Regions:
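Residues that flank catalytic or metal-binding motifs in active/ligand-binding sites
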Residues: 3, 12, 32, 128-130, ...
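Small-residue (G/S/T/A) turn/hinge positions that recur once per unit in extracellular repeat modules
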Residues: 20-24, 143-149, 177
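Short, ordered beta-strand-loop transition motifs
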Residues: 27-32, 150-158, 184-187
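Extended Gly/Ser/Thr-rich low-complexity repeat segments
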Residues: 48-53, 170-185
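Extended, low-hydrophobicity, Ser/Thr/Pro/Gly-biased non-transmembrane segments
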Residues: 51-172
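Juxtacatalytic substrate-recognition/specificity segment
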Residues: 132, 178-230
Length: 230
């Protein structure tokens, strides 16, 4: 049973909304960490939906505030809120002693089966189901993990829906730019190189390298498990 959620978020302007009644019981404006307590706890097999918005200040001449750029945006889920607080735990024993904490025993034992299930990517989740709809400028291409399911234009916005057919690690990113696309294939694998116009001098070499890597690794390690390589 889960009666509260620890939400770790950045200093960017954010809003959070859960789909069940809750109370904000702690708001740490220094480390941007909140604790929400639910009126009705989450039971085994239950689920919880979190809607959130994240905004940032615009970039200036001397300060980089935003990864959203005019023609070359790269966003990852590290810009989004995450669950838990482990990243803020004090690890140095002298510092822990100063605050009356016991010595650092945060590293799990090699025999800890729960810890063995964690990945180096994140602490709040390991393998996830992924689907995303991304909106960008009408003259740009947005890229996300997974296979493109649908693409459409609505007004001055262009939309892309991506979905992965198997679980992925809890790290994903979004790219958007005025891309050109160089396409080819290797066996049944779709190959794509996204590039800016004018930066096409080595596309053939890159594509040749992709095919060589697929051929070598499939022969010496295991068959390539996906339907595309971008």
């Amino acid at each position: 049973i889960i009666d509260s959620i620890f939400l770790d978020h950045s200093s960017r302007i954010s809003t959070f909304e859960f789909d069940r009644e809750n109370t904000l019981v702690l708001e740490d404006t220094t480390y941007h960490f909140d604790i929400y307590e639910f009126k009705n706890p989450i039971l085994p097999g239950d689920s919880l939906k979190l809607n959130f918005t994240v905004r940032n200040k615009p970039n200036t001449l001397l300060r980089n505030n935003s990864p959203v750029l005019y023609n070359g945006t790269f966003l990852s889920n590290q810009n989004f809120p995450s669950l838990g607080y482990q990243g803020y735990e004090l690890t140095d024993d002298k510092t822990r002693e100063k605050y009356g904490l016991p010595p650092n025993e945060l590293k799990p034992l090699p025999s800890d089966s729960t810890a063995l299930g964690n990945t180096y990517i994140s602490k709040d989740s390991d393998w996830i189901d992924f689907e995303a709809t991304v909106s960008t400028s009408v003259d740009q291409i947005a890229i996300a993990p997974g296979y493109l399911q649908k693409e459409w234009v609505d007004g001055d916005r262009r939309y892309f829906n991506y979905k992965m057919d198997s679980k992925i690690l809890n790290f994903y990113s979004f790219n958007s730019a005025d891309y050109q696309v160089f396409k080819d294939s290797w066996n049944d694998v779709s190959l794509e190189i996204y590039y800016h116009s004018g930066h096409d001098y080595n596309l053939d070499r890159m594509m040749k390298g992709m095919k060589a890597a697929l051929e070598y690794c499939s022969e010496n390690f295991s068959p390539y498990q996906h339907k595309q390589l971008r």
